A protein has these predicted regions:
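A structural detector for beta-sheet-dominated domains
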Residues: 31, 84, 141, 170, ...
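Non-catalytic DNA-recognition/assembly elements of restriction-modification systems
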Residues: 33-97, 101-118, 213-247
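Well-ordered mid-protein domain cores that form the structural environment of catalytic cofactors
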Residues: 1-12, 16, 168-195
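A short beta-sheet element
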Residues: 1, 121-182
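A short glycine-rich beta-alpha junction/loop motif
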Residues: 15-34, 158-164, 195-213
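Conserved hydrophobic/aromatic beta-strand scaffold that supports enzyme active sites
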Residues: 27, 110, 137-139, 166, ...
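Eukaryotic intrinsically disordered and solvent-exposed regulatory patches
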Residues: 13-14, 96-97, 125-126, 152, ...
Length: 247
């Protein structure tokens, strides 16, 4: 019904606003049974067919993507990198804490010492623009019980506490970022409240990554690898949904 109802918007504007009385008088052209009643069965079957066609097209796309990505996989060499060399720009969070900022459900992500919700504690006002930091980076959690040593990839801009340090590299995207955070998290077992993840210790951490023939991080391999995993998971889900249609 939604596409048909939305067509009513063509009749209205700021000079002729919709109201309760006008909406009551509106008429919708819908499929009807032989008895003149709304044919809900037809509408449901029609939309299921549309959904099924879209699903089949999507399945084909992801099958092809998985096939292409698999061709790019294969043997790979690995090399150790100092975190400070991998991320030439390492900056700490700028916020002084939630007591100094107003919470807002429609605001910006506020990051803190947690590995839950991709590091997001809540959403806050954007008023203090000096504390807003750019996304497309990796957030390294340096404090917090149960969270110290973890890292998360952040795509969006954010405000964060000083318990986190953010690494920037021009090759980062959500695929290379999640590849690196998965490996970077292996270090979490070495830290505790007696041996904290200071900024200095963080910069000296070692991350082992796949490399190309020049010995540089193989960003293309990392991206292809994560795309392959993503496609495989989506493909599994879509097949499950497709099986539901069979019933």
């Amino acid at each position: 019904m939604i596409p048909i109802i939305n067509r009513l918007s063509e009749k209205y504007s700021f000079n002729r606003e919709i109201n309760d009385e006008r909406i009551k008088r509106e008429k919708l052209l819908l499929p009807a049974t032989d008895k003149g009643e709304i044919d809900f069965a037809f509408m449901s079957a029609f939309m299921k067919d549309v959904e099924h066609n879209i699903l089949n097209t999507t399945l084909k796309v992801f099958k092809e993507r998985v096939s292409v990505n698999k061709l790019k996989m294969g043997g790979v060499n690995w090399k150790n990198f100092l975190l400070r060399d991998l991320f030439p720009t390492l900056v700490a969070g700028k916020s002084k804490g939630l007591n100094h900022i107003e919470k807002s459900d429609s605001g910006i992500s506020y990051l803190g010492a947690t590995n839950q919700n991709n590091g997001v504690l809540c959403f806050v006002s954007r008023e203090d623009k000096s504390t807003i930091q750019k996304g497309n980076c990796i957030a390294f959690i340096r404090n917090g019980e149960g969270s110290m040593g973890y890292s998360v990839y952040k795509a969006e801009d954010f405000i964060a506490t000083s318990d986190m340090t953010f690494g920037y590299n021009n090759h980062l995207n959500r695929y290379t970022g999640t590849f690196i955070t998965t490996i970077a998290d292996w270090v979490r077992g070495k830290y505790n409240f007696g041996y904290k993840r200071s900024a200095n210790r963080l910069s000296k951490e070692i991350i082992t990554l796949p490399v190309d023939n020049d010995g540089s991080p193989d960003w293309e391999y990392m991206e292809d690898y994560m795309r392959n995993i993503e496609s495989a998971h989506i493909l599994t889900y879509l097949k499950m949904v497709q099986n539901d249609f069979a019933y």
